[in-house]
């Protein structure tokens, strides 16, 4: 009888631990873990297990679908970026039902001469890559600023990553919307993070996303496609 009671108590403890762990899975930590898993697939030390040109499109899309939450947390200022990002990811998700890898979609568009054509998978991949880089740049600027000003961080990041490729009307709307960005405390609340955890998870995302961004850039460069678009 005592043994059964002890076993039940152990089961309850294990359930409690699992529940507690589930509760600490914040949106940012989920994104970070997804990109860390993805980054492991393109790091040189994994070259004996997977060809560096064969990152699966469905795996890539699975990680990318989580990122829209971050754009949503930034509010109105990045509504355009959020809508564009979601639309492009959805297109790639559909493409993953036909194409196995990222380089498959690029090869087809190169053959058809539609790499830069609006709506092509290769163009949409390029825009998704910019979205990932924008989040990375925002985090980077946010952490190096003395006052942790999200407005300053987002303005600098947008100017660096996306502004060169957006029309005047879009740039004007984005810059005007910067004044509606949440405060630092509001952002932490939306992300369900603390001062300590947000810095840790932001740095983890920056580290994990970098090789993915470089990997995508390399796919274009190897096919003699410039990155100035």
UniProtKB/Swiss-Prot annotation:
It comes from the Eukaryota. This is ACD11 homolog protein. One of its GO terms (cellular component) is nucleus. GO terms for molecular function: ceramide 1-phosphate transfer activity. It holds the Pfam family GLTP. An N-acylsphingoid base 1-phosphate binds at residues 84, 88, 123, 127, 166. Signal peptide: none annotated. Induction: Highly up-regulated during programmed cell death (PCD) induced in acd11 mutant. Belongs to the GLTP family. It comes from Arabidopsis thaliana (Mouse-ear cress).
């Amino acid at each position: 009888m005592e043994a059964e009671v002890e076993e039940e108590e152990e089961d309850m403890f294990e359930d409690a631990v699992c529940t507690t762990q589930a509760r600490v899975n914040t949106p940012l930590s989920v994104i970070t873990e997804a990109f860390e898993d993805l980054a492991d697939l393109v790091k040189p030390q994994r070259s004996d297990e997977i060809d560096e040109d064969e990152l699966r499109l469905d795996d890539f899309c699975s990680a990318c679908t989580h990122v829209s939450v971050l754009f949503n947390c930034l509010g109105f200022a990045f509504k355009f970026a959020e809508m564009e990002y979601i639309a492009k990811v959805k297109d790639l998700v559909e493409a993953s039902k036909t194409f196995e890898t990222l380089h498959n979609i690029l090869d087809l568009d190169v053959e058809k001469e539609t790499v830069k054509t609006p709506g092509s998978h290769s163009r949409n991949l390029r825009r998704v890559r910019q979205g990932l880089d924008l989040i990375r740049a925002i985090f980077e600027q946010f952490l190096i600023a003395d006052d942790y000003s999200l407005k300053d961080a987002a303005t600098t990041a947008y100017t660096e990553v996306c502004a060169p490729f957006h029309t005047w009307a879009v740039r004007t709307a984005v810059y005007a919307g910067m004044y509606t960005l949440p405060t630092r405390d509001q952002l932490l609340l939306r992300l369900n993070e603390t001062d300590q955890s947000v810095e840790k998870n932001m740095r983890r995302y920056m580290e994990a996303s970098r090789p993915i961004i470089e990997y995508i850039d390399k796919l274009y460069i190897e096919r003699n496609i410039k990155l100035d678009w």
